[in-house]
Amino acid sequence: MDKHRNYYFLEMNTRLQVEHPVTEECTGVDLVRDMITVAAGNPLPYKQDDIEFSGAAIECRIYAEDPENNFIPSPGVITVREAPEGRNLRLDSAAYAGFEVSLHYDPMIAKLCCWGRTRASAISNMARALREYKILGIKTTIPFHQRVLTVSYTHLTLPTKA
């Protein structure tokens, strides 16, 4: 903002981020509900100072892609879908057994989010959820996420620079 109170932006995303479940899990705030509330002309029922962060959350985007083949799209029909269940787990998905994944649209078929009191417990919860998540008939990024959640990742020893 300049001295005349004019706003300038280099970039602005006026949409809800794909990763919003991470924020929601760590704050208990329902961002979708609140966006609708504000869009309807109503005030938020809380102030910024009312929001407290608790724990850690991790989100894995599950795509109909083949991680063993440069993440090429994997269209087709989901023949089996067994979703993970339990505490501290959130699965946002419309996919089901019999669902056809098209080559013509975004191949994301689910967002899996796990919360824990600590980063380590969030990672443990995610590892369990990924083990329980079964999707057959197409290739998915589930095995890729399972490989990422290794000792190197959980102990922060992965290289982060090329």
Feature annotation, model-predicted:
Residues 157-162:
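A short, hydrophobic C-terminal helix/tail in secreted or cell-surface proteins
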Residues 1-156:
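ATP-dependent carboxylate activation and anion-phosphoryl transfer catalytic cores
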